[in-house]
């Protein structure tokens, strides 16, 4: 049933991993997805939010029958619309610069994690001391 009173329409922003998944492998809990679809069918917006790429969240929103909008890359990108559009809020160039700066100052190998391609960030494997990297970022006043 579609919500008749537009003042009662709500927007639900729902995390994917660890919230509507069954395990660390990304298996979607179908019961949770069904409840979210019921909210959408009742006239509410159901938006998926994830640290993954927004394209992954967007595809799940389509196949799951939810609102065709997803926030991804830790808030860096919004993917939406029936004609797929991306709103970039982050700047991948700044991330690449920060990575190069950290790599030049730490004496360890820093590897990018093989994940779905990102538009606004880089994803790193946990092969280095994050606190040392944070000190470099802060000391060089990097905008990441």
Model-predicted regions and their roles:
Residues 19-20:
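Hydrophobic "anchor" residues
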Residues 105-144:
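Conserved acidic, metal-coordinating active-site core of Asp-based
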């Amino acid at each position: 049933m579609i919500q008749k009173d537009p003042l009662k329409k709500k927007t639900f922003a729902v995390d994917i991993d660890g919230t509507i998944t069954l395990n660390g492998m990304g298996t979607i809990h179908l019961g949770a997805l069904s409840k979210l679809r019921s909210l959408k069918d009742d006239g509410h917006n159901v938006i998926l939010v994830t640290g993954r790429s927004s394209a992954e969240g967007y595809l799940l929103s389509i196949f799951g029958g939810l609102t065709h909008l997803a926030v991804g890359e830790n808030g860096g990108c919004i993917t939406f619309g029936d004609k797929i559009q991306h709103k970039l809020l982050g700047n991948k160039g700044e991330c690449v610069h920060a990575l190069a700066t950290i790599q030049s100052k730490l004496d360890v190998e820093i590897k990018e994690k093989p994940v779905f391609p990102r538009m606004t960030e880089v994803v790193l494997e946990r092969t280095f001391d994050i606190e040392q990297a944070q000190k470099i970022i802060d000391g060089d006043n990097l905008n990441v």
